[in-house]
Amino acid sequence: MAAGGFLTRAFDTMLKESGGKKFPDLQKAIQAYQDGSKVVTQAAPSSIVESSQAEGGGEKTGVEADEPQKVTSAEVAQQASQSKSETINVSLANAGHTLGGAEVELVLKPLRLAFETKNLKIFDAALDCLHKLIAYDHLEGDPGLDGGKNSAPFTDILNMVCSCVDNSSPDSTVLQVLKVLLTAVASGKFKVHGEPLLGVIRVCYNIALNSKSPINQATSKAMLTQMISIVFRRMETDIVSASSTVSQEEHVSGDTSSPKNEEITAADENEKEMTLGDALTQAKDTTLASVEELHTLVGGADIKGLEAALDKAVHLEDGKKIKRGIELESMSIGQRDALLVFRTLCKMGMKEDSDEVTTKTRILSLELLQGMLEGVSHSFTKNFHFIDSVKAYLSYALLRASVSQSSVIFQYASGIFSVLLLRFRDSLKGEIGIFFPIIVLRSLDNSECPNDQKMGVLRMLEKVCKDPQMLVDVYVNYDCDLEAPNLFERMVTTLSKIAQGSQSADPNPAMASQTASVKGSSLQCLVNVLKSLVDWEKIRREAENSTRNANEDSASTGEPIETKSREDVPSNFEKAKAHKSTMEAAISEFNRNSVKGVEYLIANKLVERNPASVAQFLRSTSSLSKVMIGDYLGQHEEFPLAVMHAYVDSMKFSEMKFHSAIREFLKGFRLPGEAQKIDRIMEKFAERYCADNPGLFKNADTAYVLAYAVIMLNTDAHNPMVWPKMSKSDFTRMNATNDPEDCAPTELLEEIYDSIVQEEIKLKDDDTMKKLSSQRPGGEERGGLVSILNLGLPKRISAADAKSETEDIVRKTQEIFRKHGVKRGVFHTVEQVDIIRPMVEAVGWPLLAAFSVTMEVGDNKPRILLCMEGFKAGIHIAYVLGMDTMRYAFLTSLVRFTFLHAPKEMRSKNVEALRILLGLCDSEPDTLQDTWNAVLECVSRLEFIISTPGIAATVMHGSNQISRDGVVQSLKELAGRPAEQVFVNSVKLPSESVVEFFTALCGVSAEELKQSPARVFSLQKLVEISYYNIARIRMVWARIWSVLAEHFVSAGSHHDEKIAMYAIDSLRQLGMKYLERAELTNFTFQNDILKPFVIIMRNTQSQTIRSLIVDCIVQMIKSKVGSIKSGWRSVFMIFTAAADDEVESIVEKSFENVEQVILEHFDQVIGDCFMDCVNCLIRFANNKASDRISLKAIALLRICEDRLAEGLIPGGVLKPVDGNEDETFDVTEHYWFPMLAGLSDLTSDYRPEVRNCALEVLFDLLNERGNKFSTPFWESIFHRILFPIFDHVSHAGKESLISSGDVKFRETSIHSLQLLCNLFNTFYKEVCFMLPPLLSLLLDCAKKSDQTVVSISLGALVHLIEVGGHQFSEGDWDMLLKSIRDASYTTQPLELLNALSFDNPKKNLVLAGDIEADASDSPRVDRNPDDIKDNGKVSAQASPRIGTHGTSLESGIPPKADGSEGRPSSSGRAQKDVDDVNLQRSQTFGQRFMDNLFLRNLTSQPKSSVAEVTVPSSPYKHEDPTEPDSREEESPALGAIRGKCITQLLLLGAINSIQQKYWSNLKTPQKIAIMDILFSFIEFASSYNSYSNLRTRMNHIPTERPPLNLLRQELEGTTIYLDVLQKTTSGLADDASNSEDRLEGAAEEKLVSFCEQVLKETSDLQSTLGETTNMDVHRVLELRSPVIVKVLEGMCFMNNTIFRKHMREFYPLLTRLVCCEQMEIRGALANLFKAQLKPLLQQ
């Protein structure tokens, strides 16, 4: 570019336009520039520049000299001009080269003159030239800056540019001017400041507002925006340097900013205390009180009052000295420019005129202000000092805009407020707390607010609610702050109310549309709130997780501590919020009832229980009702009275005039209405005033009277109802007293009177505030600021009142701003995710209400979709925060809105609800948890509607067909993949949730199965999802299956066989699938899987189902036999249940498979399931359907035993039950036991074949494997296997086996006992310890009344002795003999003695025991065996107790052939025989009948092979009672007695067997014991058979019949006894051992004594016979002759030595028998003489 080319061209254009004599000054100035530029010098550019710079200062005003002066000094001027031109040319040659001072003047003078010409072309050329000079940085200076470089010329040229534009200027000129101005402001060297800057902005304003060209308007607006942005960017670049300057000045001068910083720092340090609101109970500083005072004033007055207050505050800041922020002197240039621009914008936005120009100006100002606030950098938002300097202007402008009637202005107010919320909330905390209710809540709460204004606010909220951090900050700093309103909660609650607004039928379509838009926008705001919370939670949780992971990886110890301290922040705010809520509740309670309110405060520890704390609370809490404060202070109780005293004492009245003091006193409360209360309060006031002002009044009474008079005067003067008014003299007289010294001075009284009459005593709050307080409902936020919400509906009485209130608030607000301003306060920023929970708790329910009501009453699709988004977000956030109640409420509401339960009422919105619900199942299935039941019920209902044409046809009943078809089609689509995904996604659920899912689906399926007809949709899905989830870990699957199994059991037991079959088949499929998974040892999952089959098999009544179950199990065995492990247990349990089936085909099919498993897959059944296999076989052996199966089952049991014996069952699988077992204990014995027990049970089967087979297998198994059994196992076998076989024998009663005719069972029992005894003998060494219980068994049976049982048991005993006696040890023999002895005593028929009631005269043979029961008692006798003495007699202490068994069995022993007697009478009634004096006790007919019966039975010859005792036939022959009814007449008691008699005979046979076979094996004590036992038998029988007893009985029976007797027992016992004694005494030798000598001596003594006794009794009878001819004696002798004969025969074989030794005793007795009439006796006597006496005679 040529040097100065653009400038030369511009000047040429100007010269051309100013040709001739026009504008001569301009021509001269241009000519001067051109003349100087023609001379070109070759000097170095640097020298020229230096020369010009040096000369520039002196030639600055040379161009301004007169023309003649120039002519006279032409040479000098020419030289200077040449030098300057050369310098200008060099500077203009390159951009960025600036001109010097003189050069600037040389260039600018033509431009200034050009602007004065008013010629457009010259204008344009000059503007273009100036634009290039500034743009190329040729001009450098600071226009508008005092003392700045080139300030004056640049200011002038800018002013001229600004002034050359007016309304008539062409557009091109206007655009050129705008270009120059923008370039000037934007230039880095041409820096515009101060007034020039404002002038530039003013020109742009005028163009934007007044230009008729839209292009110019738009351009000017754009340039204004750029200029403002440039100004604030410059300010931001100066922040660092300005901050350092301010810091230095603060350090030196100590201005007001330093205390400000200190205050903020202190607040930061005490953040926790302030947050928790503890300062409420402490004395507040002046600033805090003033801020709250401001809030109260704002809350109680209208917007006009607030405007006035802020206006006065703004005017205060127009001076140089600003009380807060930054002083102008300390500001940087950029900050001052920004401050000027900012204030200018605010002031232009504050204008009050309502004309069009003013409105446009305000709109533009607010628009620019908003754009500026939006465009500044983030660092500017933190420049607290600068913001403090401008926030009063900003607040005022915003306040004026927020109350403007213009909707456009209000929209900009909303926009500006949104910027403050989003960007400046931390620096304008107090202002936001004030304007949020004014702009947002007031507009939304006011029903009369225009819809367009509401829409503006809602659009603003839509924007700001998308900022999650903003919402969190608002909640933390306001809702959790005790001193602030609940902005977040109130905002959401208000939006919720708007969204729920009633749908009124507005006749105006436009209004209806606007109302709908308002609702939709409010709903959008609510959704944005929820979405923001969701987003913030997600972001912060991810950040916290990252931080936590970083901390875990870090080795630093400081970081975790810091993290922990940060994590405490949310809990602190949560506590603060709870504290605030409690405080609000307390204040609300106080405003209802002051006494209860104070108690509430104390109970919740909000204030201490002392009067000073309560008084401080009453004074400092502005939201308390002044009326209720007065009411509380007037109470007469002790504590309120103390509070009133403390309240008054806390006030200071020093140096205050009386009327001022009483005004100050009554500001805080309203006096109560009762005179006594007023009296107490004013009395205390007078006392306090006098104390603070001593000497003013003589005493307090004077002050009290005056105070009372002032109250009366105030009421009189300002109450319009009072007339006439009190005069000054009246007031003076009212205070007069008799003592002039006690009266107040007249001057004081007159002063008070004038003051009160002129100005009423009022409360601190004005009348409006009082009305609002009285009308405010309980529960509103603390502080008067809340009443801003009601500013749209002012409640005033008159215009005068309004004016008074406004003036009051203006005055007080002005004072506050002048002294303190609004305290910024501590702004908290929380980043911990836990803060979200209390936020959701605060607004969750209003959100749910808004969504629910909208869904319920509306059909607007956009709003419905918003509701769906809200439901989705609400469910998500409630889930992630663990808020189960809220999550459940959201979910259940969403489920309810599907309307699947009422298809007729369904609409498209319900389809959307269903769509969202299914979408949640797909995207966030974890959130459903305890609502799965409702969700799955919806899916079930959906399938039912779609699959049922009749139901589908009713959908959306009443709508047009197109809509209905659309809804049905949508339902079909949802029933497809979306519904299917609900089940497919079950695999994504965590363990807990998937269990809930299965549980819910089972519940839904159960309900489906209850329907008619039953449905299986959910059952099918159960099977499907079971397949999906079968791969889960076993622990989870086990929990799932515990739920499934119960349901499958229920379904498998359904009354509809088709459903039951489907359930069972599904079970089979699942079982097959699960069996594919390998199972390790000791796990039981397979068993759990198959267990439902077992339960159904056991419980179902359907043959088809049972058959199907068996088929399923058979199929599973055949296909998965190698995979079955623990499942065998359930398999065998199923077959076990099948074994009891009544259908033979099921039994056979089951058994065939069991047989196949055992024969082919026995190795699979080993281990834990072996016992189940055995139990199954045992159950089959017990089946009733087929004997063949039973026998084969027993055979399979034997096979199992063989496999077990072969070692196929690994040892160690089952541990011994008793850990203290011997080391040699064989674990496999636990496998033996179930088999043995089963076989033992089978031995009592009713089928002989089965019974015998089981018996043979059992004992065969024991004999074959018994040598490997341990001692404990043998003991278990005897007690639990073998002995129970004979339970039916040992418990046999009257209904015996013989009576049933089952002879085979008797044979089995005999055989069993024999096998038992053989087994005992076979393994005697192993089981010898079992002899006592074995003997106990046998002899217990021997004590029974059933003759068959007795015969079987004693026969087995004899067999045991005969076969195994040779192995018995000495102890065994002792045990055996002791048992026999006990049995002999127990089975003695003692009832016989009692029944006949006789006395035995022979003391040495009588039974000493008392008889305590009659013949009807039980045969059981509990006798202690130790009562039997060595001599065989029963001690006197043994008194057996007799009881009766009602079910005793009849004897099985047939009557002897030679026994005969007639049939007795059947009468059973007792009759006394008074004629028979020989009887001690009268005999009943029944007893005589019993005697006859026993005579018949006991004298008969038995044919039983068990007892081979022969008794000589009696000479008396009786008819054999073969009548079939003779046994039927026998009573149970008689049967028991007869059984005992037979038992005695059998026991004698057992003893006989012992002495015959094992006598030589016995020791001396055992032999003596046998003698004693035999003697006891003989003793009892002989006592019953004694002469006196027989004779007594003979008198009661017919003479042709023998009397009752025990001759057979006596004879048998005598025979064996004599045999034993003779065997013992037959071998007397001199060389015998001591023990043998003792035995033989005892035997000799017993033998001699016994023989002598029998002979003596017989000889005595013979003597009696000789003396008399009594037939009774003959009959007695005849009956007893067999015994006598046996004794005589025994004596024939007596040892000769013994006989000779006792010849002297025997001989007299024997000689008496020579004359005996019984031939048998005489024959026996002859043989005795021949055997014993003949040898003696020969000697």
Swiss-Prot record:
Record-annotated SEC7 domain positions: 572-759
GO biological process: auxin-activated signaling pathway; defense response to bacterium; endocytosis; immune response; innate immune response; intracellular protein transport; regulation of ARF protein signal transduction; regulation of auxin polar transport
Bias type Basic and acidic residues, positions: 57-69, 1417-1432, 1516-1525
Membrane topology: Peripheral membrane protein
Post-translational modifications: Ubiquitinated.
Keywords: Acetylation, Auxin signaling pathway, Cytoplasm, Endocytosis, Endosome, Golgi apparatus, Guanine-nucleotide releasing factor, Host-virus interaction, Immunity, Innate immunity, Membrane, Protein transport, Transport, Ubl conjugation
Active site: residue positions: 674
Modified residues (N-acetylalanine): 2
Taxonomy, superkingdom: Eukaryota
Protein name per UniProt: Brefeldin A-inhibited guanine nucleotide-exchange protein 5
